[in-house]
Structures are given as C-alpha cells and as structure tokens.
Curated annotation (Swiss-Prot):
PANTHER family: E3 UBIQUITIN-PROTEIN LIGASE E3D (PTHR31531:SF2), E3 UBIQUITIN-PROTEIN LIGASE E3D FAMILY MEMBER (PTHR31531). It comes from the Eukaryota. GO terms for cellular component: cytosol; nucleus; ubiquitin ligase complex. This is Uncharacterized protein YJR141W. Coiled coil: none annotated. One of its GO terms (molecular function) is ubiquitin conjugating enzyme binding. It comes from Saccharomyces cerevisiae (strain ATCC 204508 / S288c). GO terms for biological process: negative regulation of protein ubiquitination; positive regulation of mRNA 3'-end processing; proteasome-mediated ubiquitin-dependent protein catabolic process; protein autoubiquitination; protein monoubiquitination; protein polyubiquitination.
Amino acid sequence: MVQYVVEWLPRIQSISVVVEGWKQVEIKNLKDTLMSISGDEEQVEDILLPVEVEEKVDASYKFKNRGKDLEWMTKLRSKSSKIYDSSIMSLPDGRWTKEELRSDSDFSIECLNCKQKIISKDNCQVLNDMPSEFWFELMDYWHCHKPDVKEDKSSYTRFETLKPSKNEILIGSSYFQGTPATFENVATTKENDNVLCIKCSAVLGQVTAGSLYKLHKWKLQLIRSGNTYKFPPECDITISLINVVKANSCRYVLVKCKTESLLVWIFSVDIGVTLTGNKSFKRAMKLLYTNSVTTINRCLNRQVVEELDFQETSFNAFYSALQHTNALLPSSMKKIGEWTISYTSLI
C-alpha cells in the first residue's frame, strides 16, 4: 500500500510531497489542487493538495528518490493564498463560539447522552466570551501589585472574580460557564462537586471555585439551523495548545492527566496537510510528542514548558488521534529522533 504526506508551508509558498511504497513514481497530471501519480506497475493514486499549485515554473516537477527504499519526494511551488493570514492572533478560537451561536437565535445545547436541553433561548439571554489567557495573566499580575488600600476594598475586589448574571452564558474554548440559577436542568453532587444532567445523571462538568457551573462542550451536542454538531474531546487539548501559542508563543506543552504525561512540541502552526487516503487538514499544527520520562525531564530543565492538566476523556482522545494520524505517515516521516510526529486540525 502506498503511503504519503503532503505539507504546505504557506509562508514560503512551498508544497512537499513524500510518497512511499512504489519502486518508481511519476507525475501523470498536475492541475489546481489535484496531483495524479503512477507507480512502477501502473498503479495510479490521486492526491488532493492543500492549495493550488503553481504550474508555470522554470523546470518540470519530478519525484526524486530520497536514498531509501521505495521512498520518493518532490517539492512544488504553491500559488499565493489570499485567505491566508500569517498572524498568530488569526488562529481560530475554537468551535461553538459566540459568533457561531448568535447566528441562530433558536440554537439549543443538549446533554450528549439523553438529549435533555441544557442551554436554549429559555435560559440564555446573554452570550459573552470568557476572558482570554491575557486576562488571567493580568489578574496574576494584579494580585502581586494591587494597591494596599484599607478603606473601600470593593472597588478592587469586584474585578477579581467572574460574576455572570442569571441567564448569562460565558463561552470558553471548550466549555460553558454560568450561575446555578441559569442551569436549571442540571444537578450537583456534594461529594465531588460534579454537575450532572438532571434527566440521566451523566456528568456534564464541575462546580468551579467561584461556585459557577462549568459544562464541558464534549459532554454536550449543539443543535443549530436544523443540524446536530458534536465536540470531539481531543479538541479540548488542541484549542488549549492554540491558546498557549497565542498567549505567550510557548512551543513546549506538558499535557498531563493524573499520573500520565505527554510532552508536546508545537513544531509548525497553521500549515496545510494531506495524508494517506486524502485525509486533509486545511489548517493544521505539526506536533512532535513523547512520553519518555528522560526526554521530558531534560526538556523541563532546558526549555520554557507550559504545563496543562486535562480530564482523562480528553487526554485519551487526543493521544489516540495523534497515534492514528502518525500511522498514516511514510516510515521515515513517523519520527525525528526520540520524538513521534503527528498533525492535528486547527478547525
């Protein structure tokens, strides 16, 4: 079986194609976003490119052997993409955003398990985004440097915690948050502060330190414009990685869950990728990852590493998705030294 990976680096308008599995590879057709290749036994494979290729070049495109058995590579020049924005802050904010929900006033959000309505126009009159990572950093700075004023402390302390009003929903990258009075179709448990669906008792989230209810998007489903949308649990971590890049440009993140840890190196951001079977990521991150304790400890000592904790469902789904994508890569593209290579979609 032939395996391949296509990487588009929009900043330099370069497309690299690596193919493995045939003794010979030739380009039969190359037009717009379609590349047709043939093998030594007249096998044909159509590969969908992430972007249109520049066909008028000085030399014709050809595959060259990489010095390894059955592995070939070519580099193409892409047409400039008018929709591409190289700014880090242009990276997507996630799914089920304020703008997306406001586009349909009749949207509803249900328990994924039993379809009980949790959020609808009946209990959602105001939608607001949660403050960005920058806000939380500012609050940390504020606590270290706030004035020593003894008289009227209320003018300062009222900004230290989030206090949404009744029927106001705060939208985070992978969760919704609101007051107990807003979420009438949920219940709580005293022993572990879980928030449960009132109908089926499925765990939807937790009670925060500020006594708000925090509901995970991946425990819910969105009904909008007659369509049903689910939130993949792995997106919880993917969006957190995007936020780390936006907030402080950190490229090393230690993803933790209980006793397990996965060190993720955010190698490339906002590139186009096509994998074996034409699995396509229009906007992707290239991630290198490892669970080697030796490598993790060495990196912690030498690099600035952001550490993030996640629930088991999100962690397992993210790790599984990385492994599944890695399995689609040609042999020499699966690892770099002690790091395993993978990709994840930004959208």
